[in-house]
């Protein structure tokens, strides 16, 4: 997940909750960006952009008639308007909406306007995502942008790809997708936790800590990121004195916090979503809150909403990492033209890039047949003349020139698995007002240069 500073939120992960559309809502398809910008934010997703409870039965049945060509590119949204990751929804919807707006202003794709089908993903505790996917596949979506939560994506990826349609996530970070049997139809603009785990682990040890306690929610995102962070910490000379995987729906976290305190850590890494606030309150009550023991977070919980309702100063000094590219003031202004209420920009760039890359791949394929478009997606990001906008890149494509799209999230250089091989991360610091201090944000690049 990438972010645009001023309003940093967590990414590929969770945040606070809200509910602007009901699970059964079926808004009509719209052309352009209008439909996407007003999703309200809500609690983090207990299913993380990379996690999800996958214990319930998953419907893998293909939707009859999906995956066909009708001569126009149709984009379905599968982004969080409700659920534990709803805070990530607004910037992601805005990114999709802005991309479609600019693509259509440049003449559209295959000579026709791109159509958007709005849709809520909910979180992994509901069936909202399956309902949305069924509706969008039946409506002719060529690509479904989402989900933000890895756990949610794991519940619908088979249905989408079995239907011959592309799934393109702007925020999934679970390592599971790298080797998932997706028929070559799954892609993401957010980097795998293989990269973020190394970044956050190195930040903790780089700050001089050697006895680290890890608290992580139970789900693909939490456990995967915890494992990668542990490898980085121990590989850098530090020691993980405790690694506890907790239930994100627990009524109390006093027990796991007590176990953590008993190990006398000199720092704590908290990997979670909106439940992170309750964990922090337990840490404070136990005498090992951020003012006593340095606390670190990740894209699932580090945001400007994490401190809502907490006493001033509670989060002062808390640091965290998130996929993040420094968004220009111009791009932020464009996003706000789509959604004037935006507070954070996490994954807005990744969402914008997912749509733009798909549109360019469609132009190169000369058809909106998803299986044909998918074959062009990775190449769009790495093989040719660098270009940075749909309009500029499309002119090169129509002139017969190979392109290498460099997006808002950077030069992603997608590999054969559909994963970014290079990513920019922001190291964020929260100040005494419990908000992210933009001036203290630093950037780290991980992966291929």
Residue ranges of predicted features:
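Extracytosolic ligand-binding ectodomains
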Residues: 1-449
């Amino acid at each position: 997940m990438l972010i645009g500073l001023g309003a940093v939120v967590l990414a590929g992960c969770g945040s606070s909750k809200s509910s602007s559309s009901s699970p059964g809502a079926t808004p009509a398809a719209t052309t352009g960006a209008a439909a996407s910008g007003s999703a309200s934010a809500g609690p983090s997703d207990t299913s993380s952009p990379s996690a999800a409870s996958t214990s319930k039965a998953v419907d893998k049945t293909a939707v009859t008639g999906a995956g066909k060509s009708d001569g126009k590119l149709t984009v379905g949204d599968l982004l969080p308007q409700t659920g534990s990751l709803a805070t990530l929804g607004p910037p992601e919807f805005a990114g999709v909406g802005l991309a479609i707006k600019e693509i259509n202003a440049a003449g559209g794709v295959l000579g026709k306007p791109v159509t958007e089908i709005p849709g809520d993903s909910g979180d992994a505790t509901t069936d909202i995502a399956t309902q949305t996917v069924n509706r969008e596949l039946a409506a002719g979506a060529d690509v479904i942008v989402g989900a933000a939560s890895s756990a949610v994506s794991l519940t619908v990826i088979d249905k989408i790809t079995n239907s011959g349609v592309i799934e393109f996530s702007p925020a999934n970070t679970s390592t599971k997708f790298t080797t998932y049997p997706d028929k070559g139809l799954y892609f993401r603009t957010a980097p795998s936790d293989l990269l973020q785990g190394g970044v956050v682990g190195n930040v903790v040890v780089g700050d001089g800590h050697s006895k680290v306690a890890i608290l992580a929610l139970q789900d693909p995102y939490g456990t995967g990121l915890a494992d990668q962070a542990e490898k980085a910490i121990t590989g850098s000379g530090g020691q993980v004195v405790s690694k506890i995987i907790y239930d994100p729906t627990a009524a109390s976290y006093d027990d796991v916090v007590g176990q953590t305190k008993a190990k006398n850590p000199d720092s704590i890494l908290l990997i979670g979503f909106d439940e992170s606030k309750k964990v922090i309150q337990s840490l404070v009550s136990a005498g090992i809150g951020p003012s006593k023991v340095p606390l670190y977070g990740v894209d699932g919980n580090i945001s400007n909403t994490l401190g809502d309702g907490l006493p001033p100063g509670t989060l002062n000094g808390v640091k965290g990492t998130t996929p993040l590219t420094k968004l220009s003031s111009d791009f932020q202004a464009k996003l706000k033209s789509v959604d004037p209420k935006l507070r954070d920009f996490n994954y807005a760039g990744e969402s914008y890039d997912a749509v733009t890359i798909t549109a360019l791949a469609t132009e190169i394929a000369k058809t909106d047949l998803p299986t044909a478009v998918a074959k062009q997606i990775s190449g769009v990001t790495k093989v040719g003349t660098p270009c940075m906008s749909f309009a500029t890149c499309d002119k090169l494509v129509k002139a017969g020139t190979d392109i290498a799209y460099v997006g808002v999230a950077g030069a992603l250089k997608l590999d054969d698995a559909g994963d970014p091989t290079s990513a920019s991360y922001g190291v964020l610091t929260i100040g005494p007002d419990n908000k992210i201090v933009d001036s203290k944000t630093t950037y780290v690049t991980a992966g291929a240069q």
